[in-house]
A protein has these predicted regions:
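Ferredoxin-reductase
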Residues: 1-75, 92, 112, 118, ...
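Short, conserved phosphate/pyrophosphate- and ester-handling motifs at nucleotide-, phospho-/glycolipid
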Residues: 21, 100, 181
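Reductase modules of NAD(P)H-dependent flavoproteins
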Residues: 46, 59-61, 66, 72, ...
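Phosphate- and divalent-cation-binding pockets in alpha/beta enzyme and binding domains
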Residues: 63, 84, 103-106, 187-188
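A short, basic/flexible loop-to-alpha-helix module at the beginning of a structural domain
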Residues: 77-88
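Conserved beta-strand elements of the Class I
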Residues: 91-95, 177
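Histidine-anchored nucleotide/phosphate-binding helix
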Residues: 101-113
Length: 210
């Protein structure tokens, strides 16, 4: 998609593995220091690869396409984060807004390899549409047994709590997992809590890309 970069890093020994939804700090330029990136791949110790998907949202991420070169060395610290999809609810509702879809891509791949019994709906509101990327996401969701709801700005309207409740009438038995613009996540959390959802059932990834 426009402005989106997928980067693969092959790790030396020392990485202990990660869970879907976690992130790492990556340093590609010591003068700028480390920046957080959500890991978009399930861990496979046989190939020791991490995939990061980034979008040009600020000065640092806008320069990555020109800065990163095949074969260059980077420093990776982590994994960090507790966005681990672990809970006791029978259903989960995932909301990956824009580039916030990244942790869910990793979880889809992990779930396809290790299925569980939860019923899951994944909402992906996005301002940009690239057929190849949507086809990959659709295939990953089908392989994982997850129901995908795609909403493109200007075509399907904006996602809100009312729309989610209409699409998933059983939402009260679900936990919510959100990654995307913080203000959007806070608005959804307030909406659902006002409609009776316990606060502890709404999980939000908090770090922001720069």
């Amino acid at each position: 998609a426009l402005g989106v970069l997928e980067t693969t890093v092959v790790l030396d020994d020392g990485w202990c593995g990660h869970a879907a939804g976690q992130f790492a700090f990556v340093t590609s330029d010591k003068r700028e220091g480390a920046h957080p990136y959500t890991i978009a791949s399930a861990w496979n110790p046989a190939d020791r690869r991490l995939i990061f998907i980034t979008k040009a949202l600020g000065d640092h991420t806008s320069r990555l396409r020109e800065r990163l070169k095949i074969g260059m060395r980077v420093t990776v610290e982590g994994p960090y984060g507790r966005f681990d999809f672990e809970d006791n609810q029978p259903r989960q509702i995932w909301i990956g807004a824009g580039i916030g879809i990244t942790p869910f891509v990793a979880r889809l791949k992990q779930r396809a390899a290790h299925p569980d019994t939860k019923t899951i709906d994944l909402f992906h509101p996005t301002a940009e549409f690239e057929q190849a990327a949507i086809d990959r996401l659709t295939a990953d969701a089908e392989a994982a047994g997850v129901r995908l709801h795609l909403l493109v700005d200007g075509k399907n309207g904006r996602l809100n709590g009312e729309g989610i409740r209409a699409a998933v009438p059983e939402w009260r038995s679900a936990s919510f997992w959100f990654c995307g613009p913080p203000g959007f996540g806070e608005a959804l959390r307030e909406d659902f809590c006002a409609n009776g959802l316990p606060l502890e059932q709404f999980h939000q990834e908090l770090f922001q890309m720069r």
